[in-house]
Curated annotation (Swiss-Prot):
Record Pfam families: Ig_TRAPPC10, TRAPPC10, TRAPPC10_1st
Stated family: Belongs to the TMEM1 family.
Self-association state and partner proteins as the record states: Part of the multisubunit TRAPP (transport protein particle) complex. Interacts with Shal (via C-terminal dendritic targeting motif).
Top-rank taxon: Eukaryota
Tissue expr: Co-expressed with Shal in the nervous system.
Keywords: Cell projection, ER-Golgi transport, Golgi apparatus, Transport
Cell compartment(s), UniProt: Golgi apparatus, cis-Golgi network; Cell projection, Dendrite; Perikaryon
Entry-linked InterPro entries: Ig_TRAPPC10 (IPR056917), TRAPP_II_complex_TRAPPC10_C (IPR022233), TRAPPC10/Trs130 (IPR045126), TRAPPC10/Trs130_N (IPR056913)
Annotated function: May play a role in vesicular transport from endoplasmic reticulum to Golgi. Has a role in one of the several mechanisms underlying dendritic localization of Shal channels.
Source species taxonomy: Eukaryota, Metazoa, Ecdysozoa, Arthropoda, Hexapoda
Keyword Oxidoreductase: no
Name the UniProt record assigns to this protein: Trafficking protein particle complex subunit 10
Length: 1145
């Protein structure tokens, strides 16, 4: 069927025929913009055309209103080759006028006048006419439509020069065709609308209306507007369905008799039909059945959707198409053979599925979502046909059923001999592998499946697996489980229960998760039958146990399976020992057999470690008769602490010591929420209430995670238990107990009931787990003391807290002190002498804990004593006391810091050649008494003379008070400093505290005396000494005298004067050499700057080492003398300075 716009031609017909092929071939070479009316969106379309000679007959239908837009000419062209104005006026103008009047009389305004020019070069060189034929044509006929009058050079004679004019001609034809379409489509839509409004008038025929509106759809399709064409087919589909529905309401339509043909042939849709308009011609000429008409309508819609590259929409529309067609067949009561409609549905489903398989990508779920129910539909229809034809497992077709197969096979028909995809250039369709055989059509597969039981079973299993996998791919697990139920039943019919078990198990898990109790009970019966056939005693035992607890089943059924459960349970132990180890094989879900009603901790007092936990469990047995549980265990774990970053939740519930499990709906969970700022200040406070979520009857499987057997067993390290408990049907109270071994806040987690080789584990407790606390108070020992002072007895106390520890009769605490620290228990008032004796202090002390009870607290007074440090320390004196307690295997070290009671320092003083030692005692922290200070020196040749007065009374010393002792050091002249470089001096003194004035202890300190020999003596004299005036230069004579021989030959002197008192005139420093001389004199000029008694300018003497004596030592160095080697006799001298004039001060 050729669908191309018609262009008519008049005038010089041979001339147009010479140009026809070029014009018709050039029109579709490029797209053009179609600006539609009524503000419809602009489209880019590609036009094609066919040419016919002008005929008035087509315009007669147009005038009468009985015309088709496919057959109506879209453009009328008048062609002339007249290049002479006179000839035009004589003949051509009249012919054009008659032609235009004819078009106008039929209401046609889509015309064009084409002037084909033939240039005469000789005339154009000598004569140029004022008016051309084209100007005359436009003047006569194109005053308002001059764009419809076009001239073109004859391409046959002027091939090179005619290119531009020919291109303009083709563009003008495209434009006028689209302009004509705008006008004609609007008129045609009005015509369709008027026809549709007459649908209730007697004699109205839907078939005529169908072809009229389909012609419009074909025009849109030809213009490459498949969406617009699809709208027309959808309107026809909806209108036809509406007519059929009204027919069911006793509104009879005469034209429906054409579709009431018996369904002798029930071909399915064919999306690979070679001639897509074959059925259109059959509908027009012969008449078709309802199924054939519906097939053609869906095929046309599918073709347009393929053009739009919307294959998922085809799959989406298929089920609606099938169901609505079946309803229409039922409404108009068509006669058909049993199974015919199933065959038709099956072929249609497989045809669409094969198309989708070529276009589907694994990552695009849209098409899979629509294909999954189609696979399921094909599977169901095939099963119905198998049941009808005796092809199910275990059945043998009878002669009558074989006759049905023959009739159905003939009604299905054959697939088209040449299968070509009627949309050739579809980029989304994937090419098959060249080595892969093309799939058979749906009709061929159905015929093959109806031919034998093996082919039927193979196709059914393939369709079922495809349906399940597609449902799973689009995460429609419920639908996949239902398909698995059918597949499981099919495997059971095939006597292959081991393959059916997996599908039944998946379905059972889904049904239990969504609380379909009745359906899950029926599935359990199927599972029990499978396990019995398989000989799986363990699974059969567990399934029989679950069936006996199903309240939805009859009592006789439950009792039968309960007896089977007890019978199989006796032989289960030997069966399990013979089988290999299977993880969680003997676990059962407790909730399927028992219901936990309440868990209550019976202990009335706080549970202390090593005490017994008493728990009362209320559980309901769902068995029809009583059973004996060998062991009932309830484990508990440490409660997880929930910490919030932005808020602090403080629970307002009761004390956890007595916890009773309540229903979550009886008490609201109220909690206090405190929100703090960054500086720990309270920002806001609120009371929050967490409402329990209502139980959902149907939930997503991905969120429920219901399992047939518990996969995780909780940690049963801590549990309460009861043994040999008889559980009767209904509510049972079970008393359980266990010893509390670990402390903490505990929460019940899982219940385990053991019967023979089976263990029934709870998935989770049905209410908020009861919490209880096992508390313990750890025993502790601490030392309590204030500031401790070294050298005197200091009191400390040992505080022992028993906590929950059980003390043995011989319990004791051992205290071990560090070096120079001793300890004892506090004094006994009856033994004063032993108290004053320091020998009672020990480095290790054992304190017995006589009759010490749990939770008892005892304070034991102790005393410590440590030696006073002999030298000055910058920090406190640190010691350690290690506690060894009976409740701990490790020692507990405790740091003990002592402050010194006093400290001793010494200074060396020189007077000429005499040396004096000054010992300064400074009080620090204690109030003490001092007496009998002595200095000892064991070095021969050194003698210390005590210069202190003899005192009979002790001297008190306290903080910030100092006591000074002075001694003279005499060294024999022969004992030089080289022989005695260091003189060790020991200072010893007795001290006692005010609290114990009779107990005297010894404090000793050692000093090292170095550089104590006077090497040089420095003298200075100021002249004039008596008449020293202000701002008058005076002469200061310095004298350096060597007292003892020494290696220092070069000395440097410096005058360190106060700039406010003295000014040195000239050099203030210099170097003198004492080599081979005993003394050296220096004269300096100084000037007093102030009046009064001024101290003599200070003079410093230092060791001098000249530089440059070696390569490594290039600079001179100055080293100071120690204080004892240089005696400066000018330190205490003062000079009286008087004013030079009366006004100076």
């Amino acid at each position: 069927m050729q669908i191309k716009p018609i262009i008519t031609y008049s005038g010089s017909c041979p001339l147009f025929r010479s140009l026809e092929s070029q014009i018709l071939n050039a029109i579709p070479l490029d797209t053009c913009e179609w600006r539609r009316t009524f503000q419809r969106p602009t489209k880019h379309v590609r036009l094609e055309a066919q040419a016919q000679q002008f005929n008035v007959a087509a315009l007669e239908k147009y005038k009468q209103g009985d015309w088709s837009i496919l057959e109506h000419p879209i453009l009328h062209i008048f062609v002339t080759e007249c290049n002479d104005v006179d000839t035009y006026k004589a003949t051509i103008r009249e012919a054009i006028d008659i032609w235009l009047k004819t078009l106008t009389s039929y209401g046609v305004s889509d015309w064009m006048i084409l002037l084909v020019e033939t240039l005469d070069m000789r005339k154009t060189k000598n004569f140029m006419p004022r008016t051309t034929v084209l100007d005359k044509i436009r003047l006569d006929f194109g005053t308002k439509n001059d764009d419809r009058c076009i001239s073109v050079l004859n391409p046959a004679k002027f091939e090179q020069k005619s290119t531009e004019s020919f291109r303009c001609l083709v563009q003008r034809i495209r434009f006028l065709m689209l302009t004509s379409y705008n006008r004609n489509i609007v008129k045609y839509e009005e015509l369709i609308r008027s026809k549709r409004e007459k649908r209730n008038i007697e004699g109205w025929d839907f078939r005529q209306y169908f072809f009229m509106q389909e012609d419009l759809a074909l025009i849109f399709e030809k213009l490459e507007l498949p969406t617009e064409a699809l709208i027309q087919y959808d309107e026809l589909d909806a209108m036809f369905s509406q007519f059929i529905t009204h027919t069911g309401l006793n509104e009879k339509q005469q034209w429906l008799n054409h579709f009431r043909k018996p369904l002798d042939a029930f071909h399915g849709i064919c999306l690979t039909r070679a001639d897509k308009f074959e059925m259109r011609n059959k509908i027009r000429d012969e008449g078709v059945s309802l199924l054939e008409f519906r097939n053609y309508l869906f095929e046309r819609q599918a073709y347009l959707l393929l053009t739009c590259n919307d294959i998922p929409e085809i799959a989406k529309r298929l089920l609606n198409f099938l169901f609505s067609t079946l309803r229409e067949v039922e409404l108009i009561k068509l006669e058909c053979q049993e199974g015919a409609l199933c065959c038709w549905e099956f072929v249609c489903a497989l045809e669409v599925l094969q198309l989708c398989e070529q276009a589907m990508e694994p990552n695009e779920l849209t098409c899979f979502q629509h294909c999954a129910p189609i696979w399921n539909l094909a599977k169901d229809k095939l099963y119905e046909l198998g049941k009808l034809c005796g092809l199910l497992p275990g059945c043998t077709p009878t002669s009558e059923q074989l006759h049905i197969v023959v009739q159905l096979s003939s009604g299905i028909g054959d697939a088209p001999s040449e299968q070509h995809q009627f949309l050739q250039a579809t980029p989304q369709l994937r090419d098959r592998s060249p080595n892969r055989k093309p799939k058979k059509s749906g009709a061929e597969q159905l015929k093959e499946a109806l031919g034998s039981n093996q082919a039927f079973q193979k196709l059914y299993l393939e369709l079922a697996e495809l349906a399940i996998s597609t449902y799973k791919h689009v995460t429609r697990l419920r639908s996949a489980r239902l398909v698995g139920l059918d597949l499981g039943n099919f495997y059971c019919a095939l006597n292959e229960p081991h393959k059916a078990v997996g599908f039944f198990t998946d379905l059972l898990r889904e049904l239990k998760a969504e609380n379909w109790h009745m359906l899950s009970s029926q599935t359990l019966l199927e599972l029990a039958n499978c396990y019995r056939k398989m000989g799986d005693s363990l699974a059969y035992t567990k399934t029989c146990s679950s069936i006996s607890c199903c309240a939805e089943l009859e009592t006789l059924v439950r009792t039968f399976y309960f007896d089977e459960f007890l019978k199989s349970l006796k032989t289960l132990k030997t069966t399990l020992s013979a089988q290999p180890s299977i993880e969680n094989a003997n676990y059962c879900v407790l909730e399927d057999h028992f219901r936990i009603l309440d868990i209550e901790v019976v202990n009335q007092k706080p549970i202390i470690q090593d005490d017994y936990i008493l728990v009362q469990l209320k559980v309901e047995s769902l068995y029809p008769r009583g059973v004996v549980a060998e062991n009932v265990k309830l484990c508990y774990e440490l409660e997880a602490s929930s910490l919030e970053l932005a808020m602090e939740n403080v629970s307002l519930t009761a004390s956890p010591s007595t916890v009773k499990a309540k229903d979550t709906s009886s008490r609201l969970k109220v909690s206090l929420q405190l929100v703090y700022k960054q500086d720990n200040r309270l920002h806001s406070a609120a009371v929050a209430c967490d409402l329990p979520k209502s139980k959902q009857p149907v939930r997503r499987t991905s969120s429920t995670k219901r399992k047939l057997s518990p996969s995780v067993q909780a940690d049963f390290t801590n549990f309460v238990q009861a043994e040999n408990i008889a559980l009767q049907p209904g509510v049972n109270l079970i008393e359980m107990k266990a010893k509390a071994t670990r402390v903490g806040c505990w929460q019940f987690k899982q219940l385990c009931i053991s019967m023979s080789s089976l263990e029934f584990l709870s998935e989770q407790l049905p209410f908020m787990p009861a919490t209880f606390e096992i508390s313990t108070k750890p025993a502790s020992a601490t030392l309590e003391f204030k500031t401790l002072i070294a050298g005197i007895v200091q009191p400390i106390s040992l505080n022992v807290s028993g906590g929950s520890f059980i003390f043995p009769p011989d319990a004791k605490i051992t205290l071990r002190c560090s070096k120079n620290l001793r300890i004892r228990q506090a004094r006994n008032t009856d033994d004063e002498a032993a108290y004053n004796d320091d020998q009672s202090f020990e480095s290790t002390l054992q304190v017995p804990l006589v009759q010490f009870k749990s939770f008892e607290e005892r304070r034991i007074p102790l005393e410590v004593l440590t030696d006073m440090p002999g030298r000055k320390v910058s920090k406190h004196h640190e010691h350690h006391i290690a506690l060894n307690c009976p409740w701990s295997r490790t020692e507990l070290p405790i740091a003990v810091d002592f402050q010194p009671a006093m400290e001793a320092t010494c200074r060396l003083h020189t007077c000429g050649t005499q040396k004096f030692l000054q010992v300064i005692m400074k009080g620090m922290e204690a109030h003490l008494l001092l007496q009998h200070a002595q200095v000892k020196c064991d070095v021969p040749g050194v003698q210390l003379l005590d210069l202190n007065p003899e005192s009979q009374q002790p001297i008190e010393i306290y903080k910030s008070l100092t006591v000074t002792y002075l001694y003279e050091i005499q060294v024999e002249p022969l004992k030089t400093e080289h022989e005695l470089p260091v003189v060790k001096v020991h200072f010893v003194i007795k001290y006692a505290s005010l609290s114990q004035p009779d107990v005297w202890r010894t404090y000793g300190c050692a000093f090292d005396l170095v550089d104590y020999t006077t090497l040089f003596k420095l003298q200075a004299q100021l002249e004039p000494n008596e008449l020293c005036r202000l701002r008058t230069v005076c002469n200061m004579n310095l004298k350096i005298t060597k007292v003892h021989e020494n290696p220092y030959t070069d000395l440097m002197y410096e005058v360190l004067n106060d700039q406010n008192l003295w000014a040195v005139c000239g050099r203030s420093a210099g170097v003198v050499s004492m080599k081979d001389v005993d003394s050296h004199s220096i004269s300096l000029d100084v000037m007093p700057l102030s009046t009064g008694f001024l101290p003599m300018p200070s003079i410093r003497l230092s060791k001098y080492t000249a530089g440059g004596k070696s390569k490594t030592d290039g600079h001179s160095k100055v080293h100071p003398f120690p204080p004892g080697q240089v005696y400066n006799s000018t330190k205490s001298m003062q000079i009286h300075v008087i004013a030079s004039v009366a006004g100076d001060q």
